[in-house]
Amino acid sequence: MVRLDLADVVLRRMQEKDIEAVKALIKEGCEGTENRLILHLLTRPLALLLLAILSSILRCVLHSFVLALVIPVFISVIYLKLTIPRSAGILGSCRPYWDYIGSSYHADTEPDLPNPHLGRAKLTTNQEKTRRRKKAKEKEKMNESEQVDEDELKQRAKVAGEVWVADSDGEIVGCVARDGWSRDGVCRVCRLVVQCWYRREGLGRLLVQGLESRTKQKGVCRVYAHVPIPSKVGEAFFRRLGYRLQGETAGIEEEEEDDYEDPEKGWLGYPLTKVFVKDL
């Protein structure tokens, strides 16, 4: 496993040049999740009942037990393979797809998320100069390429949400997505991904805590996090950060009424996510 110095990590908004790297990172993080979600949905009681009924009908038609058993499962898996990736990529979003262009609009003007590890090490003069040159070149490219309708981009940016990336010497090693949900005092974390080489280094914790700190400054008092339902690692991670599963309250009626967030729904209406809550 590669060691990562958190003092060298910059937590900044995703820019247009980062979109392909972020998509690849999310795709990598979804590889195991997608298969576990499919297995979870196929083993629900209603799904098993429907598969059994269809298998019985096909057995009478095809006169083959093996084909009658395999065909319904095969068709269901193909269907879920085609429909789940959109949901597995960014979970819990209020929109059916993620607008990466809208999320990156004017991202370079947004200040970085706080990183408490930055005080341990300072960049050398050469590194600072290189970073300034990169930013200057990026601004020039943006001015040349971003000739899209400004009003349209502003409208898209309002509802597109935010993607914050962990940048280590120009390499995107992690990201966290915040939905563009407009409910007052609430923030929704839709996806947290860390590159496989840098897991267990504290990077995920750094991303989430940095986002919590920024949203708290903006008046947000509650954070919801959507975690894929078969992910035990994700559940343990958010519990360690002080989150609780939605519905786990002290028994106070007012708290239980406020403590509600719709989980992402999948095939036959079964939830794809667990919703975790934290009051800031």
UniProtKB/Swiss-Prot annotation:
Name of the gene this protein is made from: nat14
Name of the molecule in the record: Probable N-acetyltransferase 14
Major location category of this protein: membrane
Pfam families linked: Acetyltransf_1
Region (Disordered): 111-152
Annotated organism of origin: Danio rerio
Transmembrane segments: 37-57, 60-80
Cleavable signal peptide: none
Keywords, sorted A to Z: Acyltransferase, Membrane, Transferase, Transmembrane, Transmembrane helix
Enzyme Commission (EC) number: 2.3.1.-
Presence of keyword Transferase: yes
Entry's Gene Ontology cellular component terms: membrane
Residues covered by the N-acetyltransferase domain: 116-273
